[in-house]
Amino acid sequence: MLDGVVARPQEXAARYYAAGY
């Protein structure tokens, strides 16, 4: 999940937080 945060912190962040990151 860290890759997504590094690739798109603004776009992915919301999804990762919702997923339980």
From Swiss-Prot:
GO biological process: antibiotic biosynthetic process
Domain of life: Bacteria
Keywords (A to Z) from UniProt: Antibiotic biosynthesis
Cited function: Involved in etamycin biosynthesis.
Protein name: Hydroxypicolinic acid-activating enzyme
